[in-house]
Amino acid sequence: MSFRAARLSMRNRRNDTLDSTRTLYSSASRSTDLSYSESDLVNFIQANFKKRECVFFTKDSKATENVCKCGYAQSQHMEGTQINQSEKWNYKKHTKEFPTDAFGDIQFETLGKKGKYIRLSCDTDAEILYELLTQHWHLKTPNLVISVTGGAKNFALKPRMRKIFSRLIYIAQSKGAWILTGGTHYGLMKYIGEVVRDNTISRSSEENIVAIGIAAWGMVSNRDTLIRNCDAEGYFLAQYLMDDFTRDPLYILDNNHTHLLLVDNGCHGHPTVEAKLRNQLEKYISERTIQDSNYGGKIPIVCFAQGGGKETLKAINTSIKNKIPCVVVEGSGQIADVIASLVEVEDALTSSAVKEKLVRFLPRTVSRLPEEETESWIKWLKEILECSHLLTVIKMEEAGDEIVSNAISYALYKAFSTSEQDKDNWNGQLKLLLEWNQLDLANDEIFTNDRRWESADLQEVMFTALIKDRPKFVRLFLENGLNLRKFLTHDVLTELFSNHFSTLVYRNLQIAKNSYNDALLTFVWKLVANFRRGFRKEDRNGRDEMDIELHDVSPITRHPLQALFIWAILQNKKELSKVIWEQTRGCTLAALGASKLLKTLAKVKNDINAAGESEELANEYETRAVELFTECYSSDEDLAEQLLVYSCEAWGGSNCLELAVEATDQHFIAQPGVQNFLSKQWYGEISRDTKNWKIILCLFIIPLVGCGFVSFRKKPVDKHKKLLWYYVAFFTSPFVVFSWNVVFYIAFLLLFAYVLLMDFHSVPHPPELVLYSLVFVLFCDEVRQWYVNGVNYFTDLWNVMDTLGLFYFIAGIVFRLHSSNKSSLYSGRVIFCLDYIIFTLRLIHIFTVSRNLGPKIIMLQRMLIDVFFFLFLFAVWMVAFGVARQGILRQNEQRWRWIFRSVIYEPYLAMFGQVPSDVDGTTYDFAHCTFTGNESKPLCVELDEHNLPRFPEWITIPLVCIYMLSTNILLVNLLVAMFGYTVGTVQENNDQVWKFQRYFLVQEYCSRLNIPFPFIVFAYFYMVVKKCFKCCCKEKNMESSVCCFKNEDNETLAWEGVMKENYLVKINTKANDTSEEMRHRFRQLDTKLNDLKGLLKEIANKIK
């Protein structure tokens, strides 16, 4: 089957699944979207399903009362029943079929649970029964059927057996399987029902289990309550009482089964009547052909046997004859242990050997059996063991989480691979093992040296492995010849992103794109939206707009591996994404891109656990990027540095450094290789061995540059222009430009201070005019940065400070120009003074490059955030105290200025130790207040009839004490603790934080024009003129993308691929060494434990 056909087939199956409605009762919910009305369903059942009634009374000679051999008394027979005295009773001759009178919903009165039930003849056609289950009771077509048998009587559930049953139910739930049991509240069936109930309670209703019980109608206790009333119309609800205290030999029905099929052959008290119909139903299901089955177009069915006696033996025998594989639990006792022990016999199987095993495991049962029946048992066992390839044995003592799953999958695989029509169907066998995630079997049985696999043969199963998140199978297919690049066509990627991509992830991606306005996020969102082109979204105005499509699909067609990697990363497919990452080109860039995407998405996820998983995976990819780059750098520094600046359109045109910074991957930026690269950029052509003081000295004594005082990384090519080359290389170095800017900025601040303090006149003097020209140069530089960075310019706090400083300076000039007005001139000077503070604080940013001062500056920045939190808490305390104090002391103060002083200013000063003096009546000074409110004094406190302060001191003084205690001790110490935590956090990663912040300064000066201040202004004029000339001539830049097409890029990526393989080998070797070390430690512990046991025995013997 071609991949396109497989994909269309998967799409059809998905649509069929959406169109069908699953109806479950008891632990399953009933569907409300029925294709038939209740009356149609009743008509269908009455037309196709029958009950059986005995119409010939044959007296049972062994019975004491007048009872027929069918088990019913003569009075319980219908009117007109004939008397039969000579013939042997047979249900086919002596019973007659009538329309069934027992079907509908069954409600268990004890627990109030519901289920579906029907009474049907033992001769009912299996096809009609299957139609009832799937089309009328709306059960989804099973992906697997598990027929559980054994342990109907005297069954005691062991803890390990309960674990096996729990795993069996989990498999049924996860695989969409049907479980077939005896359906009674007795023995094995009772415990199966309880496990079904426990698993149903712990999971959502959409994942409920289908547990079908098939029991004999004549063995059901209280079955009269299941018969419909004569006047009942439509569907019937039967009220069934579970009477556990009844000593009746009959069984009660189990309340945890979802569907009950009650098989009737006209008898009462005759067990095993249902066996024939159950076998027919199992055979019909196993032979039914369905589309898209991973079992050769059939529904897989497996018999699960434990314990049991004769009926279990017959059930296993029938299953084996019908080519149904069987899983037997060794250690569960009785017939299961007999079969398990005989499977291990290597010699030819003799009757005596079989009988020996029967006597060993079933001594009482075999001793009571007639010889003929014993021979029948031996015959059945031999028939079973002739098809030993259909038997799979698991040991109850070794019951683990995967033992049941492995056993069922292995049983199905053996049955499938040994069948005549499917033994050469390698693709079908591989699908089966993929469905059950059996990698070892696939490795050992299918991918052998006997067969050569083509890439096209593995494409269908590869797609299944991707959507089922089977990373080990994906790796296996890649190792066996699958070409991932050829497999990832546009149709495949469209199918993955449109039908196997979480809508929630898509919404989170869209939220992140809108929130952070990030280039990579926008690119990835457009890429995903291009595949999900049928998706529509509604904008804020309520209008519909189509998804944005990528106009250039080349990033997708040229980089399908990166698109698949992004698909896996966005959905947090941890192990699968790692397998795909190993196949991509530009692994370092891909790892950093994954880290950035995951960290950004984690910020917008509402689920804390999901956000934590994304953060954890992001950190893993950062670690991979660090380790891989370290491997590359240790091999070749120059090529490793080329990797840092390599960009790819599949990641929005970003390079490794940009993605690492945007993802805040400080560990990567702090790597020696990255820092050495930044240092090369920082010093330019100047050798890094040159001392900084030499470079700074050359700024003041320029001729030293050409005298060999400063060393350079390389020698000039043209000897005649050697001196010119030295000067150009020196003054274009970012470090020299930075140093010159520092000198210039300090000179600018000194000039600014001189003008403010000594030379500020009504008419500007030359120093002030020089100051204006220097600020103009700063203004031009900020305009250039804004033009280059766009909106991102204002994301940097220092840029905001620069803009604010320039804005204040312009405002100061505006006031300064009105020199005729003294007040305006003074206002201008005040604004200049405030602006000087901003420009001076801006000096802090320059020294972030210092290894010693840089971390301290970062601490200051983070402590400012702590101060804002502190001020919020302090404001609550301050306003509460200030309003209460003012209201207690004074009445109807109308002056806002004094209200502000009393409510805000004075409580604020109290935090610094200035205790309010107006809360103590004994020391209150009326000379410093006013009663009229007209003077520049605070309002006096309210007086009583004796002209004494009215306020109660027993309130005001304790109030001040509590306020001082809360602010000066509690809040201030809280702030100190916050500062301590912040400093400690930065101190722990002192080196990383500084190196990360250093990157921004290096990039800032590397992106600037390499011309010292203030001469750079001429370059700005030249750039403006050039831009205007281009606009007038309407020149267009038609350069096309050359991503990954340059020879140097291909060589670098090929070399990185080799380094990646070395890195992966080291990881695997390290993991193997760790495992070996653990095994060695366990062996040492085992030896020590044995020595201790021996020592304890010696001590015990001495005591005796």
Curated annotation (Swiss-Prot):
It is found in: Cell membrane; Membrane raft; Endoplasmic reticulum membrane. The keyword tRNA-binding does not apply. InterPro entries: Ion_trans_dom (IPR005821), TRPM (IPR050927), TRPM_SLOG (IPR041491). It comes from the Eukaryota. One of its GO terms (cellular component) is external side of plasma membrane. Its expression in most prostate tumors as well as the presence of an immunogenic epitope suggest that it may be suitable for the design of peptide vaccination strategies for prostate cancers. Belongs to the transient receptor (TC 1.A.4) family. LTrpC subfamily. TRPM8 sub-subfamily. One of its GO terms (biological process) is thermoception. This is Transient receptor potential cation channel subfamily M member 8. Non-selective ion channel permeable to monovalent and divalent cations, including Na(+), K(+), and Ca(2+), with higher permeability for Ca(2+). Activated by multiple factors, such as temperature, voltage, pressure, and changes in osmolality. Activated by cool temperatures (<23-28 degrees Celsius) and by chemical ligands evoking a sensation of coolness, such as menthol and icilin therefore plays a central role in the detection of environmental cold temperatures. GO terms for molecular function: calcium channel activity; identical protein binding; ligand-gated calcium channel activity; metal ion binding. The chain crosses the membrane at residues 734-758, 766-789, 797-817, 823-848, 854-890, 955-983. Residues 187-195 are annotated as: Epitope. Ca(2+) binds at E782, Q785, N799, D802. Residues 1071-1104 form a coiled coil. It comes from Homo sapiens. It is a multi-pass membrane protein. Changing N799A: Abolishes ion channel activity activation by icilin. Does not affect ion channel activity activation by menthol or cooling agent-10. Expressed in prostate. Also expressed in prostate tumors and in non-prostatic primary tumors such as colon, lung, breast and skin tumors. Glycans are attached at N934. The lineage of its organism: Eukaryota, Metazoa, Chordata, Craniata, Vertebrata. It catalyses: Ca(2+)(in) = Ca(2+)(out); Na(+)(in) = Na(+)(out); K(+)(in) = K(+)(out). Activated by cold temperatures and by both natural and synthetic cooling compounds such as menthol and icilin. Activation of the channel requires the presence of PI(4,5)P2. PI(4,5)P2 regulates the activation and desensitization of TRPM8 channels. Activated by intracellular Ca(2+). Residues 896-912 dip into the membrane without crossing it. Homotetramer. Isoform 2 and isoform 3 interact with the C-terminus of isoform 1 in a thermosensitive manner with decreased interaction at 21 degrees Celsius compared to 37 degrees Celsius. Interacts (via N-terminus and C-terminus domains) with TCAF1; the interaction stimulates TRPM8 channel activity. Interacts (via N-terminus and C-terminus domains) with TCAF2 isoform 2; the interaction inhibits TRPM8 channel activity.
